[in-house]
């Protein structure tokens, strides 16, 4: 437990450390953590693509369900994290422990729900995209393993957030890193040595998650004295569960919107492009590669949000505005780097997925076209973090909903159908740039509203 003096020192850092240095200090561990998560996202696809392109399609079609699972895990954990941090700040250890216990209980319930989906819904989900039997069979095997052993990812994320809620983020980096390394080592073993293909990739993934979960439990028991979980007398609390989801549901919905978008985008690509399943592979490769650009920006957001929130509470207007400006600039730097890489090196990037000449024919122009969207994406993600800092997550949800469902899917459908009629698959990829531009306009309008109502009325100060 930190002493009162240490708490004051930590608070002073948020209010007095030079903003640029503070952003780097707060965000760098989060950025590293997010890059590890991005590695998790890509490694299965890289190894599976070495088997054949149909196997890559099977994994790509599984992604929306897999992503939704992670969304439920992280969304629930976000609520638990926030409530525990608040309870500990109030010196209410009993409440913090009960919230943690209810969080673990919800992780168990969620894993049971996805287990049932894996057993009974996997084949139906994959077959709703394609009629190719090999892809249906392989995709079903992949989802059944990932969902069947989903307790690994649910408990891993929950116990990692328990560590984060007490400020022990270093241990979460260890658990994620160990899980990712195990996954990378075991993927080629199960896929090629044991000749298990796509199913082997899924087994390697869940083993990595389970090991990370066990490690996270160990760190909580031995390195996290602020929380003491005791399930002998545990009873679920409707009040605590309601509080958890009141905070966590917006995060879950944000991910759910992304999963719905990916599901329909896959259906559009198969139905209305000449490349069909190969177009899905290009889209899947883009999604995995994109995470290496977007995940660091999300990590930046995770570091920036408490800085803005603290200085808003302290009414330090100058520091708030400087933090917002720098976060947008840094996010755009990441995005511009991504745009350059996607535009200049599409063949190299697709090579990670063992791209065939036909996939390169579709993928090279696709990545070049999509690279334009990065110019808008960075600022959009950064402003999403700003909205959360002021408790205005609804603005982030509006922007995300408009981008992914109101603009992207309808425009992709129109461009894909028109492109099919003239024999041009490239048009569909412009839907991303159009959607990101629209989302940026919405985010800017929302920020102007927020600035006028919340930031502008604050009295000017002379602090750095």
Can you say where each PLM-predicted feature lies in the sequence?
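N-terminal transmembrane alpha-helices
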Residues: 14-46, 50-51, 67-79, 83, ...
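Transmembrane helical elements of multi-pass membrane transporters/channels
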Residues: 25-44, 145, 156, 179, ...
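Helix-terminus/linker motif at the lipid-water interface of multi-pass membrane proteins
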Residues: 35, 39-57, 126-133, 189-196, ...
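Short runs within selected transmembrane alpha-helices of multi-pass transporters and secretion channels
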Residues: 77, 145-164, 172-180, 201-214, ...
């Amino acid at each position: 437990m930190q002493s009162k003096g240490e708490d004051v020192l930590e608070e002073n850092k948020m209010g007095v450390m030079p903003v640029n240095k503070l952003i780097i200090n707060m965000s760098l561990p989060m950025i590293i953590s997010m890059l590890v998560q991005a590695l998790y996202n890509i490694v299965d696809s890289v190894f599976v693509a070495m088997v054949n392109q149909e196997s890559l399609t099977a994994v790509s079609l599984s992604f929306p369900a897999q992503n939704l699972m992670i969304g439920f895990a992280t969304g629930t954990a976000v609520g638990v994290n926030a409530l525990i941090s608040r309870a500990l700040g109030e010196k209410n250890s009993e409440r913090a422990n009960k919230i943690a216990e209810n969080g673990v209980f919800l992780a168990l319930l969620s894993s049971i729900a996805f287990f049932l989906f894996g057993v009974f819904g996997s084949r139906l989900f994959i077959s709703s995209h394609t009629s190719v039997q090999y892809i249906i069979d392989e995709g079903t095997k992949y989802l059944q393993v990932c969902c069947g052993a989903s307790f690994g990812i649910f408990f891993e994320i929950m116990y990692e957030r328990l560590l984060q809620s007490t400020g022990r983020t270093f241990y979460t980096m260890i658990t994620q890193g160990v899980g990712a390394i195990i996954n990378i080592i075991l993927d080629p073993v199960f896929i090629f040595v044991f000749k298990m293909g796509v199913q082997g990739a899924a087994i390697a993934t869940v083993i990595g998650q389970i090991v990370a979960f066990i490690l996270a439990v160990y760190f909580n028991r031995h390195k996290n004295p602020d929380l003491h979980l005791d399930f002998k007398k545990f009873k679920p609390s409707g009040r605590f569960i309601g509080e958890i989801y009141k905070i966590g549901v917006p995060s879950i919905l944000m991910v759910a919107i992304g999963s719905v978008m990916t599901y329909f985008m896959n259906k559009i690509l198969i139905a209305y492009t000449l490349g069909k399943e190969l177009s899905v592979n290009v889209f899947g490769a883009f999604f995995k590669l994109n995470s290496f650009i977007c995940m660091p920006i999300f990590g930046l957001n995770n570091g920036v949000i408490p800085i803005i929130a603290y200085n808003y509470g302290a009414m330090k207007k100058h520091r708030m505005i400087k933090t917002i400006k720098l976060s947008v600039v840094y996010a755009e730097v990441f995005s511009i780097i991504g745009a350059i890489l996607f535009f200049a090196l599409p063949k190299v990037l697709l090579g990670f997925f063992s791209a065939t000449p036909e996939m390169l024919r579709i993928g090279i122009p696709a990545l070049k076209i999509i690279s334009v969207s990065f110019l808008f994406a960075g600022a959009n993600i950064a402003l999403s973090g700003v909205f959360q800092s002021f408790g205005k997550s609804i603005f982030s949800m509006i922007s995300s909903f408009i981008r992914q469902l109101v603009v992207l899917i309808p425009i992709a459908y129109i461009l894909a159908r028109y492109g099919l009629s003239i024999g041009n698959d490239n048009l569909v990829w412009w839907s991303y740039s159009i959607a990101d531009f629209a989302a940026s306009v919405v985010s800017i309008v929302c920020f102007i509203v927020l600035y006028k109502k919340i930031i502008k009325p604050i009295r000017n100060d002379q602090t750095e």
